[in-house]
């Protein structure tokens, strides 16, 4: 995993270099998880971010780019700049952690690295979302929430593959996970 905030010097400059080295020297699955700058950070930073993402995309099997500006849709108008950046960092962490948990957590239907590799190897742009549900309609609510995620700026339409992970309590019934 290569996680970075794009638009500045460090993440934008280092992430493509690290990805290139990983691709050229190993058979690793290279997954980029990055954030794009908030609008208030300016056009120059946005342009630098887009150029960095374009370069990073050349060296990643899969790239998930999250626009920080979309965070304004889900957070309080009174959020401080510091907390907005903290929230952006948390989105990166959740993205990486969720993919890692698919591999490391044993479930009713076991998925492993081979499954993740099959979906993410040479996949290009990625779309990832999480949904939560509770109560009688928890399964429908979780799916709806995941599909309507305001943080994503690309569509699931035209996807080449899907990695779908369901996590529930010990009371999860098979009727909620059967097609």
Placement of each model-derived feature along the sequence:
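Tubulin/FtsZ superfamily GTPase core signature
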Residues: 1-179
